Amino acid sequence: MSIVLRLLSVLKHQQNKMQLDLSVNSYKLLDYSMEWSSDSVVLPPTSSDKTVMMPAKATSSRKRHRKPKLQYAKRRFSPVNPNDLVLVQQEPTHCVRLVFPLSKRWIHFDGLVYSLARLNVSMTVDYHVTLALIYAPEAGECFGNFLHLCPLLKDCLLEFKKLCVLGKTLTILASEWPFFTDVKKNKDNLTVPKAVEWLKEHGYEIYNSQLPLHMSLAKLHDLPQAQFAEAAGLCHYFDPREFALPCALEVVKIGGGKVNGRSIPLARFPINNEFKFIPYLYQCV
């Protein structure tokens, strides 16, 4: 009888142990991404053959499997708009300009000269038209090839009209005379754009000042605000008109020295004009 009781006790103990193993395995089979933490406690069976289990706290152990080539996550960037791009230009170092004969008499500027003298402003004595501003920082820059540009500028008759203030400089706008094709059939009134294109083709970096073709007449930088407004108002009272043929092409260093108010050219190339200025052009004024 005692043997039977002992066998029953052993069987019951093994049955309780099997139930314990099944309960643990059932928790493991719920989710492979869940594991037991240190907070889960399983009490061994007591002498009374009862098993007590405490609730287990699950923590995530999911790992991200990344490919070696995708070590860094991809980032999304907003598209770039054209307005977001800023083109940085180098400051110009030299000025390529057209100059006129010293004997040229600007008779239609006489009234303007007298009015500016009342404001203690002197007209410039270095009349020129800026053809292009270029960036050439090399100290030994050679401008000898500009000699081949002069034939293109031959017989380029310029018309000056309409006063305006650009920045704080009194200027007059310049353009090729549109009626010159009737006199010279080989002209197309596109000399200035072709000359600028010639500079680009020969490797010169052109600085875009976004200013129209003009000729500076007087500097108004030192005037008080009231006198500056009065000088700027002269543009509405005077409407001079002049014609001139450039006699030479000059290269001047920006900020270079001057003699008697005239910039010292680094290079000067004469323009051999065939067309002679004729008096009847004044009848168009």
Curated annotation (Swiss-Prot):
Keywords: Host cytoplasm, Host nucleus, Host-virus interaction, Inhibition of host IKBKE by virus, Inhibition of host innate immune response by virus, Inhibition of host RLR pathway by virus, Viral immunoevasion. InterPro entries: ORF4b_HKU4-CoV. This is Non-structural protein ORF4b. One of its GO terms (biological process) is symbiont-mediated suppression of host cytoplasmic pattern recognition receptor signaling pathway via inhibition of IKBKE activity. It comes from Bat coronavirus HKU4. Its main location: host cell. It is found in: Host nucleus; Host nucleus, Host nucleolus; Host cytoplasm. One of its GO terms (cellular component) is host cell nucleolus. Plays a role in the inhibition of host innate immunity by inhibiting the interaction between host IKBKE and MAVS. In turn, this inhibition prevents the production of host interferon beta. Additionally, may also interfere with host antiviral response within the nucleus.
